[in-house]
Regions:
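C-terminal catalytic "cap/lid" subdomain
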Residues: 1-330
């Protein structure tokens, strides 16, 4: 099957972990094992988050006083190259000899009038204590938001993806059975200027929403959003919290989720399934195969497809012509 897999930034860099290349390489190596296992039986397309990484680069850039800070679109491109390289190398090491993998920079068009530009919600960078956040906010005039796990993070605009530029090149590689890593960090945000030419813009697109669009455009059978939590919970953070094993978009419409974390994943899952996708899964990176097969995580399915897809996933034991896209959370 064809699966788009979205890897969260927090799956590549654990919460509270120092943002060193070695730490990220170690985490990517672990991720590569899970992805290689999934790729044994399916075709995967990999997207990834960049929240911690792009935030760190922005902080480093802002600290270099002689020059103006590097804009977020350029920093996003930097993270696509950096993280894509790490994933490609470790995945190549984890997969059979002869496996073909390609990492592509992806520009994604957004609307210059998207309301997200006046209401930032996307957390990026490190988690600050209240005192640290006070200093950073005063120095850089950044918007900050409290994390559910404690501390504060910078938030930036996260406009909706309208179109993935260069999609034909991605499709060409996918159809040639090449494992593609693309749409990193949600893609490089660009807008159409007054002259009709594309221009970069200060934003970080949510990678889950871009991954859902990518999965739709590639006619993927499944979208997996892999992060550092077990899935979607009812009554999260209370003594009564319980993992939701499977649910439909209409049921999710009745629930409320945090705008900067689980909310985008829910929106992406619902959008993909409503567009005809068979399955959208949310859960831990280490449970990638189990989520797809219905043994872990949360699975979002259309009513009529629930039983049918569960049966298909359980009986699937050898490679098929379908592809899978993986999105990594941030």
């Amino acid at each position: 099957m064809r699966i788009v897999v979205a890897l969260g930034g927090n799956a590549l860099l654990k919460r509270g972990e120092r943002m060193t290349i070695e730490a990220q390489r170690t985490n990517v190596r672990i991720a590569a094992v899970a992805l290689a296992d999934l790729a044994r039986d399916h075709q995967i397309i990999i997207a990834h988050g960049n929240g911690p990484q792009v935030g760190l680069l922005a902080l480093q850039s802002a600290s270099y006083a002689p020059e103006l800070p590097t804009p977020l679109d350029v920093l996003g491109a930097e993270t696509e190259g950096m993280i894509g390289y790490l994933i490609e190398q470790e995945l190549m090491n984890a997969m059979p000899p002869g496996t073909r993998i390609a990492t592509l920079l992806s520009r994604v068009e957004v609307d210059v009038n998207d309301p997200a530009f006046t209401s930032p919600t996307k957390p990026i960078g490190p988690v600050y204590t209240a005192e640290e956040a006070k200093i950073v906010r005063a120095e850089h005039l950044w918007s900050m938001v409290s994390e559910s796990t404690g501390g504060l993070r910078r938030v930036v605009p996260s406009p909706a993806p309208l179109a993935i530029l260069g999609l034909d090149a991605i499709r060409l590689l996918v159809d040639a059975q090449i494992t593609v890593i693309c749409a990193g960090g949600g893609g490089i945000p660009v807008v159409r200027g007054e002259t009709g030419k594309m221009e970069g813009v200060e934003a970080v697109i949510d990678k889950d929403r871009t991954s859902a669009l990518l999965a739709q455009m590639l006619a993927a059978d499944a979208l997996l959003m892999l992060t550092d939590v077990a899935g979607v919970f009812r009554d999260f953070g209370t003594p009564d919290q319980a993992l939701i094993a499977h649910i439909t978009p209409p049921e999710l419409d009745q629930m409320v989720f945090e705008a900067g974390s689980m909310g985008p994943k829910i929106a992406a899952a619902c959008a993909f399934v409503r567009a005809g996708g068979a399955l959208a899964g949310i859960g831990r990176l280490s449970d990638a195969r189990a989520i797809f097969e219905g043994r872990a995580g949360t699975r979002v399915l259309a009513d009529a497809k629930n039983k049918q897809h569960k049966k298909q996933a359980k009986t699937m034991s050898k490679p098929t012509s379908m592809s899978i896209g993986v999105a990594v959370t941030d």
